[in-house]
Structures are given as structure tokens and as C-alpha cells.
Design a protein with these regions (language model features):
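Gram-negative bacterial Sec-dependent N-terminal signal peptides
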Residues: 1-23
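N-terminal maturation segment of proteins
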Residues: 21-188
């Protein structure tokens, strides 16, 4: 659905449910900005759900990249929690709660569980998904998709080197970690 139509529908719903158009528009702008930034920060996931603006890029999983992404998520969480849910339509209230809890879950993974420092397979899956998502679906001419595949493949050695630098305490059985590291060596 085109963004203008979605925004118009959101405004109509807001009027019918008691939220003011300005409040509904502000919330919609916040959500749109959040997802624009999310897709930019996570181009591999963006490709997998059909957003193709960043098909030639891979996620920045470096420590600096993780810090920037975490700060972005905290800013989004602060902005969402600052919105009084009583000013939103029922649907927007639900969307707000879902997004808040999704962000909290991601922050738990990144800041507390720190999977990116424990699971070598994160980097292997990122590398394989980066290419698979481009060739698996026929969303653009093959030549266009192959240009993106080549661009991403050129970034895979850096992605795997980032994983090697980030992993501090491999998670799970040592055979699981060895298997992930072996797969990483085979695709680098």
C-alpha cells in the first residue's frame, strides 16, 4: 500500500477512534522513521522481507556498529514510551506496545545476552543469508540481483573477520562452535 494511502487510512482511523490527526500522524512518522533506520542498519533482513533499497550492503556487526545500533534502538524506545497511549487509536496503541516490546527484546539480546559475542554462527548465517536472500526470490532482473550478490560477497571476508574479532566466549558445546567456525572458514 503506498505510504500516502497508509497515512490517510491511519488518519481516518484516528478520527474515528478519538485520537487526533496530529497525534496519529506523529506516531506514524515515528514508526516510518524507525523502520527506515532499521532497514538501513540491517540490510540483510530488509532484503529478506522485500525491502530492496540496501541490497548491495551487509549489516555492520562490528563493536562500533553494535554500539550505534543500540543507541538508535534506545532513542526509538525513548520516543515510543514518551507517547501517551491514551492519545492513540486502539490499533496504534497495539502497534506501539508491539514495537516497544520488540525493541526491548532486541536490546536484551544485544546488551545482556550479547549473542554477537558468543555465537560464531551469527556471522556465518549473516554471510549466507546475505547472498541467499538475493538469489532465492525473483524480485528483480537477474543482472541486477547478481550485482548486489557480488557487492555483498566482497563484504563477506570483512563480516567474518568482524565475527572473529567479536567472539569472546563461544556459546554452546564446543563442537557447535567448532562447526560454525569451520563453516566460516569454508566460505571466506
Amino acid at each position: 500500500m503506498p505510504m500516502k494511502l497508509m497515512t490517510g487510512a491511519a488518519l481516518a482511523a484516528a478520527v474515528l477512534t478519538g485520537a487526533t490527526p496530529a497525534e496519529a500522524q506523529s506516531f506514524q512518522n515515528l514508526v516510518t522513521t524507525f523502520y527506515d533506520n532499521e532497514f538501513r542498519a540491517h540490510p540483510i533482513a530488509a532484503t529478506s522481507i522485500g525491502v530492496h533499497d540496501y541490497d548491495a550492503e551487509v549489516d555492520d556487526l562490528s563493536r562500533d556498529g553494535q554500539a550505534k545500533d543500540t543507541a538508535r534502538l534506545h532513542r526509538a524506545l525513548d520516543a515510543l514510551t514518551a507517547i501517551d497511549p491514551a492519545t492513540l487509536s486502539a490499533g496504534d496503541r497495539d502497534d506501539r506496545e508491539i514495537l516497544i516490546n520488540s525493541i526491548k527484546g532486541t536490546l536484551l539480546d544485544v546488551e545482556t545476552i550479547r549473542y554477537w559475542q558468543k555465537d560464531p554462527d551469527v556471522y556465518v548465517r549473516s554471510a549466507t543469508s546475505a547472498v541467499f536472500n538475493l538469489v532465492h526470490r525473483d524480485f528483480a532482473p537477474l543482472a541486477d540481483r547478481l550485482r548486489s550478490v557480488i557487492a555483498r560477497e566482497r563484504q563477506i571476508p570483512m563480516l567474518l573477520a568482524t565475527g572473529k574479532a567479536n567472539i569472546e566466549h563461544p556459546r554452546g558445546r564446543s563442537s557447535t562452535s567448532r562447526s560454525a567456525m569451520s563453516r566460516a572458514r569454508s566460505i571466506s
